[in-house]
């Protein structure tokens, strides 16, 4: 009876998550939100007739979207559910990985156990920021045959365990940059590092600390020329975006705050700076109060994709014809 009820519950959940298959085939989805245009230049990137579509709903907290060209699919994390889901135009939502972040056998319920940021490495393998296991992990199986078996990429800095790796980006050399705030920790006393870091992983597997001065480093991205690293700080008392100039070896030369949105946070504009994606134009699509802020490289706020939800992250497909957005319970898309 318990198994039967579990099957029913899971089936209902997946049905709630799905937009009807026939709707996906016709391209007709529920439209939500709006586009706030503060500078005319935003219309060069976001068409004037663009609308925000809800592709699927019913998630606990959607995060870490990643477009996989090989599968013509988007995968994304649901952190509280310790799962990764896959969305395609033809089949809508399917469970892709579970567990995705915490792989232990303890029955203790973890606050944020799942994976967060996702990325493909140079060998086209799935890399996961794993909150629950406090590591950067790599899925052992092929993308078209996913199995929840992982190997450790990195799990500590100078012998001290990471807090809970959050978001990740890769440069053309195959080096990773990632953030490590404390959101995945259930108890503060298990924290081993006395700071929240931004790190680089070299192709040889060396972990280099780049930044240790930010209260809540979260979203991360690289400029198209890979000379600038962008970091979003999800501290409601200091909700800011930073840019850092890097030398040829990928080390920080100098940094500055480019936009402070602390005063934008309100009941009408939910959310703090979280994940971000950098467009080929150099502009940032950075989640924050109200939805996804479009920000120029020098920090000018060009406009906002207003989602109506606290918004966690976003990513482009391979030709930047669509922006996929994870916003609380929703998976959304803006066609560009």
Locate predicted features.
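C-terminal motif of bacterial Sec signal peptides marking the signal peptidase cleavage site
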Residues: 14-16
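Sec-dependent signal peptide recognition
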Residues: 2-8
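Sequence-structural signature of mature extracellular/luminal beta-sheet repeat domains
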Residues: 18-336
């Amino acid at each position: 009876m318990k198994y039967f009820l579990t099957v029913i519950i899971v089936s209902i959940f997946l049905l709630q998550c799905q937009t009807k298959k026939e709707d996906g085939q016709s391209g007709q989805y529920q439209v939500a939100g709006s586009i706030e245009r503060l500078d005319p230049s935003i219309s060069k990137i976001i068409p004037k007739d663009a609308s925000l579509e809800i592709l699927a709903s019913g998630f606990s907290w959607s995060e870490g979207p990643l477009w996989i060209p090989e599968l013509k699919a988007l995968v994304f994390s649901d952190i509280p559910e310790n799962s990764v889901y896959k969305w395609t135009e033809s089949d809508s939502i399917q469970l892709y990985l579970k567990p995705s972040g915490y792989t232990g056998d303890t029955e203790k319920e973890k606050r944020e156990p799942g994976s967060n940021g996702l990325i493909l490495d140079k060998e086209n393998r799935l890399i996961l920021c794993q909150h629950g296991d406090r590591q950067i992990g790599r899925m052992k199986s092929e993308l078209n045959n996913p199995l929840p078996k992982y190997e450790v990429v990195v799990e500590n800095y100078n012998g001290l365990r990471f807090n809970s790796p959050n978001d990740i980006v890769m440069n053309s050399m195959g080096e990773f940059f990632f953030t490590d705030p404390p959101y995945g920790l259930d108890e503060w006393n298990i924290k081993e590092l006395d700071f929240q870091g931004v790190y680089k992983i070299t192709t040889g597997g060396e972990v280099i600390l780049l930044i240790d001065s930010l209260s809540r480093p979260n979203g991360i991205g690289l400029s198209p020329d890979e000379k600038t690293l962008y970091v979003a700080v999800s501290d409601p008392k200091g909700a800011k975006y930073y840019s850092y100039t890097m030398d040829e070896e990928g080390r920080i030369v100098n940094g500055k705050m480019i936009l402070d949105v602390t005063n934008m946070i309100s009941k009408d504009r939910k959310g703090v700076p979280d994940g971000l994606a950098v467009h080929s134009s150099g502009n940032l699509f950075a989640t924050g109060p109200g939805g996804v802020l479009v920000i120029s490289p020098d920090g000018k706020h060009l406009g906002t994709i207003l989602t109506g939800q606290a918004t966690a992250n976003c990513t482009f497909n391979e030709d930047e014809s669509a922006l996929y957005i994870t916003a609380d319970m929703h998976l959304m898309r803006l066609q560009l």
